[in-house]
Each structure stands twice: as C-alpha cells, then as structure tokens.
C-alpha cells in the first residue's frame, strides 16, 4: 500500500473524481466519505484533515472510528468531531464502532478485544453492555451533529475452532481475516495468520 501522504492524497483525489463522475452519470447524489482511525491522537486526525484541505480532495463526510476501549473518551470523540465540522466545513460520522458481548474465545484464535484489559469501566462484556455502548456512542455523536453511526463487524462471529477445513473454505469464499489474496497489499499478514476471526466477540 501507499505510505507517503502526498501520494495518498493523489489516490484519494482520483477516487473522488471517479465517484463524482459516477454520481453524475447515474443521476444519484452519491456522498464521498474519507475514514480515519486513532482519534485518541487528535493532532494526527487534524493533520489528515489539513492534508485533505491542502490537496483539495473533494469529499463530503469525514468518517471516524471510535471504540470506547481504544480511542479515548466520549468527550474526546465529540471534540474531534466538532473541530472537524467547524474548522473544515465537513459532515462527520462515526464510521465504525462496537463493543464485545463476551471476553470468551470462540474459535481458537486470538481476539481483538482481550478480556479485562479492554473492558471499559461501567460496561462489562455482556450483551446489555454491547447495546448500551452503541446507544451511548449514538447519543454522544448526535450531540455534536454527526450525521450517523455505523456498527462495525456485526457478522464477525465465531464458527467453531479454526481447522484446515475452515481455512480452505475461507480462502475460497472469503472471510474477515487476511486471506492470501491481500498478499500484494499486505505481504506481512496475507494468508499467514488468523485462520479464524480476530474479532469474534
């Protein structure tokens, strides 16, 4: 993948141009969203917004990942969203969020959410807490004018222990893990690990 910001901006500009053209050809108002993670590091997010502005990338929505167990407080998420709206004139959405309903392993592979280390105070790893976190994220985002929230990985549930049989099926039909088809883009991980699901809770 491309790692230099000027080159990334050029790719985003070309992608944006293609979407605008498709939007015009189809007669549909297709919104363009960019999506960034690690919002606990405010300056990094603002740097990306500056890069987009300086490169004149045409987009409508700035998407943010927000996980309560990785990305800081609700207040920080709100501060970032508000700053982006006010300083860059863009709509903002929470492009991905989720929370675990259990800390148990379901397929013999490691999980992204690992037991007590990732549990947020007030939200034990239960079905009710998962629902409460989603509701609280939606409420916090709405308070600062975000246009929407997307739940991430709703299909990432375990299907049993990772076996060679499962790996062959996932390789053929696809899965949520890094199959060999991504080796050109991600040679360090493509098809090499996570024969199950990295997020099965």
Positions of predicted regions on the chain:
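Active-site cleft segment of glycoside hydrolase catalytic domains centered on the general acid/base Glu
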Residues: 1-51, 57, 72-79, 166-170
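The substrate-binding groove and active-site-proximal loops of carbohydrate-active enzymes
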Residues: 2-6, 38, 65-71, 119-129
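Hydrophobic, Leu/Ile/Phe/Ala-enriched alpha-helical segments that form helix-helix packing faces
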Residues: 15-23, 52, 84, 134-141
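Short, well-ordered coil/turn segments that N-cap beta-strands
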Residues: 26-31, 57-60, 88-91, 145-147
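Active-site beta-loop-alpha junctions enriched in small/polar residues
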Residues: 35-40, 64-69, 97-100, 152-156
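Flexible, glycine-rich surface segments
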Residues: 49-106
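Conserved, mostly hydrophobic/aromatic
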Residues: 62, 130, 149
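Aromatic-rich peripheral "rim/lid" segments of glycoside hydrolase catalytic domains that contact
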Residues: 79, 83-86, 102-115, 119, ...
């Amino acid at each position: 993948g491309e790692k230099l910001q000027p080159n990334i901006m050029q790719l985003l500009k070309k992608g944006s141009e293609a979407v605008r053209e498709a939007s015009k050809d189809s007669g549909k108002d297709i919104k363009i969203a960019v999506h960034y993670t690690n919002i606990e590091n405010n300056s990094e997010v603002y740097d990306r917004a500056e890069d987009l502005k300086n490169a004149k990338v045409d987009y409508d929505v700035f998407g943010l990942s927000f996980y309560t167990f990785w990305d800081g407080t609700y207040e920080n998420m709100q501060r970032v969203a508000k700053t982006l709206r006010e300083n860059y004139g863009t709509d903002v959405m929470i492009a991905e969020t989720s929370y675990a309903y259990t800390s148990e392993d379901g397929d013999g592979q490691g999980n992204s959410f690992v037991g007590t280390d990732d549990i947020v105070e007030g939200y034990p790893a239960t079905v009710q807490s998962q629902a409460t976190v989603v509701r609280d994220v939606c409420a916090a985002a709405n308070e600062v004018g975000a246009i929407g929230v997307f739940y991430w990985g709703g299909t990432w549930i375990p299907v049993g222990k990772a076996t060679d049989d499962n790996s062959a099926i996932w390789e053929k039909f696809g899965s949520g893990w890094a199959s060999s088809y991504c080796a050109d883009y991600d040679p360090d991980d493509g098809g090499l690990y996570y024969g199950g699901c990295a997020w099965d809770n």
